[in-house]
């Protein structure tokens, strides 16, 4: 069985599921009606409080457990019955393009776990799985693959994947990667959230959550006072300006380039990017699951090329 998982610092995506990269661990069930997994005699529940940024997600077990949630949600979606007979899984994952060479082997082994059988309970159902193969792909390019039919018409374009803690930038020529520009800028929207929350607390003694900031950026109804809203908009514009300057220093001028934006951060910031009028030709990949679906397309292409089943 093929299962594709996009591990974001802000959220986990499969082709069919989306949830925050946050976990609570306990010795027993919490008593609240929420998704849970029991594995290795511990109970894990999902929370909207995301995990602090990890450049290397193999540092501890949390992203492994989040992957068990992703696998379980895909099994449930596909109506796979609970079973104690191991389900063999080929797991497709991704990494920021600039980190790929350094981290991909460790990342793959983290999930492979010597192909051991893993038994767990998910929301009262019992599953047994064995991750028999792990294949990793570059994020951003995977998202671009889902739009290859459109992108191949552009002689040069830049895919910009704005995530929780990284912004990945990849140059494309007729839809194919040009390794002359491969950047991972470690300043995604989580750093924006943290900066806004810190300054708002210092100036106005108000504690903000990510969702409070999202409401203002998206121009949604909010209970926040005007000065806080203005602070959020100003700091978000400064965040985008700093990023555009970062790109310009690396030879990418957003005022003259075709820029294809992907990722949840891009969808959050879309209105401000468009209203800012600094990006001449913005194209937005609106599917937040694009990377996960792109991993599947890349895998299918490899299988077809190798004549495998």
Predicted regions and their residues:
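Acidic, metal/cofactor-coordinating or nucleic-acid-engaging core segments within structured domains
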Residues: 200-203
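Nucleotide/phosphate-binding catalytic cleft detector across ATP-hydrolyzing
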Residues: 1-157, 176-191, 211-309
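Ser/Thr-glycine-rich phosphate-binding loops at phosphate-binding pockets of nucleotides
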Residues: 162-168
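PRPP/pyrophosphate-binding module of the type I phosphoribosyltransferase fold
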Residues: 169-174
């Amino acid at each position: 069985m093929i299962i594709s998982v996009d591990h974001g610092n802000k959220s986990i995506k499969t082709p069919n599921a989306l949830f925050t990269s946050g976990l609570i661990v306990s010795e027993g069930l919490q008593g609240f009606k929420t998704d849970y997994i029991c594995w290795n005699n511990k109970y894990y529940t999902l929370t909207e409080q995301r995990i602090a940024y990890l450049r290397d997600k193999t540092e501890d077990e949390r992203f492994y457990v989040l992957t068990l949630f992703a696998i379980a949600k895909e099994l449930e979606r596909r109506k796979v019955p609970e079973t104690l007979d191991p389900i063999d899984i080929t797991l497709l994952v991704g990494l920021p393009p600039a980190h790929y060479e350094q981290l991909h082997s460790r990342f793959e082994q983290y999930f492979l776990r010597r192909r051991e059988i893993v038994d767990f309970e998910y929301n009262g159902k019992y599953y047994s799985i064995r991750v028999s193969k792990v294949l990793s792909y570059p994020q951003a390019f995977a998202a671009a693959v889902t739009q290859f039919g459109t992108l191949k018409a552009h002689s040069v374009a830049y895919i910009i994947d704005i995530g929780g803690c990284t912004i990945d930038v990849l140059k494309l020529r007729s839809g194919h990667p040009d390794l002359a520009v491969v950047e991972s800028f470690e300043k995604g929207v989580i750093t924006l959230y943290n900066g806004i929350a810190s300054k708002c607390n210092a100036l106005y003694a108000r504690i903000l959550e990510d969702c409070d900031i999202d409401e203002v950026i998206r121009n949604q109804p909010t209970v926040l006072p005007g000065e806080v809203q203005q602070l959020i908009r100003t700091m978000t514009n400064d965040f985008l300006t700093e990023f555009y300057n970062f790109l310009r220093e690396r030879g990418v001028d957003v005022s003259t380039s075709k820029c294809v934006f992907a990722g949840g951060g891009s969808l959050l910031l879309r209105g401000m990017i468009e209203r800012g009028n600094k990006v001449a030709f913005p194209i937005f990949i609106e599917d937040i699951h694009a990377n996960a679906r792109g991993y599947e397309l890349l895998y299918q292409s490899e299988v077809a090329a190798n004549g495998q089943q």
